[in-house]
Curated annotation (Swiss-Prot):
<dbReference type="GO" id="GO:0005829">
    <property type="term" value="C:cytosol"/>
</dbReference>
<comment type="function">
    <text>Member of a network of 50S ribosomal subunit biogenesis factors which assembles along the 30S-50S interface, preventing incorrect 23S rRNA structures from forming. Promotes peptidyl transferase center (PTC) maturation.</text>
</comment>
<keyword id="KW-0963">Cytoplasm</keyword>
<dbReference type="Pfam" id="PF04751">
    <property type="entry name" value="DarP"/>
</dbReference>
<keyword id="KW-0694">RNA-binding</keyword>
<dbReference type="GO" id="GO:0019843">
    <property type="term" value="F:rRNA binding"/>
</dbReference>
<dbReference type="GO" id="GO:1902626">
    <property type="term" value="P:assembly of large subunit precursor of preribosome"/>
</dbReference>
<dbReference type="InterPro" id="IPR023153">
    <property type="entry name" value="DarP_sf"/>
</dbReference>
<keyword id="KW-0690">Ribosome biogenesis</keyword>
<protein>
    <recommendedName>
        <fullName>Dual-action ribosomal maturation protein DarP</fullName>
    </recommendedName>
</protein>
<keyword id="KW-0699">rRNA-binding</keyword>
<dbReference type="InterPro" id="IPR006839">
    <property type="entry name" value="DarP"/>
</dbReference>
<comment type="similarity">
    <text>Belongs to the DarP family.</text>
</comment>
<dbReference type="GO" id="GO:0043022">
    <property type="term" value="F:ribosome binding"/>
</dbReference>
Length: 183
């Protein structure tokens, strides 16, 4: 057996390139699995969206076809299809998809908050009457005062008579129309 010289390691090709900026980042297998699972969950969120919401997310043709297929499949086949969608997402830039999905969620959350505010305003209209009507007219100057008073009066009668809250629903719908016409 021949003995190699001590400097044999110095002759490795490509070893003369010394760049400290090229650090190798090691990723654990567990982290890779967590990332894959997170992309699978993202795919499941996209699959659960309706057609109108799906149109607002930037997807290429292959991914969109896989998502539409997953929407039609049930049980075990759906699980396998979600794994395929997760795999497809790993090969793509998912940041635009995440941003579009967050935008959709945020729009839904804003709508829920608006509905809660309108419900509270409706309840105040029924309980307080003219004071709350003044608040509505400050928010929406084109609101019909007479229509509000009539509906409030009917809502109070329904509440006292333990009848279904038909007028209260009408007040809410009217307030929602005012809010939508404003924005």
């Amino acid at each position: 057996m021949t003995k190699q010289p001590e400097d044999w390691l110095d002759d490795v090709p490509g070893d003369d390139i010394e760049d400290e900026d090229d650090e190798i980042i090691w990723v654990s297998k567990s982290e890779i699995k967590r990332d894959a699972e997170e992309l699978k969950r993202l795919g499941a969120e996209i699959v659960d969206l309706g057609k109108n919401a799906l149109d607002k997310i930037p997807l290429d043709a292959d991914l969109r076809a896989a998502i539409e297929l997953a929407q039609r499949i049930k049980m075990e086949g759906r699980r396998r299809q979600l794994q395929l969608i997760g795999k497809m997402l790993r090969q793509r830039d998912v940041e635009p998809i995440r941003q579009a999905l967050d935008k959709l969620k945020n729009r839904h959350n804003q709508q829920v908050v608006l509905f809660h505010k309108l419900e509270n305003l409706r309840d105040r209209l029924i309980d307080q009457g003219d004071d709350a009507i003044a608040e509505v007219l400050n928010l929406w100057p084109d609101a019909d005062r007479q229509q509000l008073r009539t509906r409030i009066r009917n809502a109070k009668k329904e509440k006292e008579g333990n009848k279904p809250p038909k007028s209260a629903r009408q007040i809410f719908q009217y307030l929602r129309e005012l809010a939508e016409n404003e924005g």
